[in-house]
Amino acid sequence: MDEIIKYYNAQNEDDRLTIDRSHELEYLTTMRYIEKACASNSKILDACAGTGAYCFELALKGHKVIAGDLIPSNVKFIEMKNKKQPILDNIYTGNILDLSNFQDDSFDVTLCLGALYHLHDMNDREQALLECKRVTKTNGLIFVAYLNRFASFMNNFTYHPDNFDTIMQEFRTGNKEVFYRSTPVEMEQQASKLGISKLYNIGTDGVAFMYPEQLEGLSKKQYEKYLEYHFDTCEDEHTLGYSLHGLYIGRKQH
């Protein structure tokens, strides 16, 4: 976990989802599906809240939100934002592998939007999902973000074709430094095995990483047309693996 904390201490995570349109897609799509799937006035745990990209917006929409993150600097950032407009129910520093501060069946919705980017060990990945499931009410919703192995290969090969052996090794294992790349099928199988039934499995940013400059060059009207295309196709199982970021949305069965 120290390496993950070190990584995020060196990043400007607060700007990641707004830096350009290719990154904004991930945020817009994730919010679209949270709003689509969640009932109004839900009690939500944002267990990997980062710097608060989702928790504040969800609280403004009337949900009761508790936000936590592994990275102390991220939590401080959330606390500072919340002081300006107190709207979150609670804020905490914590590890997704241990949500023991919360009782079983506490939340209507649990968001795990980042932890699985970094957990290499399959037991840890299962533990994260099990903890999310434990604190979620029966028939409640669990949102799990993951990185896609196929898209990562395309991205790496596009910019670093001379490192093909390394790229292939990363593709076979899914591992690269502090990151782990999954596949849509792997994500579905793991969640299903743990009693989290699939509602949606979507590509949140599609292949936008392949043409960020073209997206930036679109007029507002053209960009709206692109968003329409993206939202129409983001659930297509034939192209899921070619989205850099995936989002599995499941329901707790028991």
Regions found by a protein language model. Give the residues of each.
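Conserved class I S-adenosyl-L-methionine
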Residues: 1-50, 53, 57, 142-167
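Class I SAM-dependent methyltransferase SAM/SAH-binding core
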Residues: 53-98
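A short acidic, Gly/Pro-enriched loop at the edge of an enzyme's catalytic core
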Residues: 100-110
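A short glycine-rich, Lys/Arg-flanked "PGG" loop and its adjoining helix->strand segment in the class I
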Residues: 126-138
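Short alpha-helix
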Residues: 178-195, 201
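A C-terminal cap/extension of S-adenosyl-L-methionine-dependent methyltransferases
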Residues: 200-254
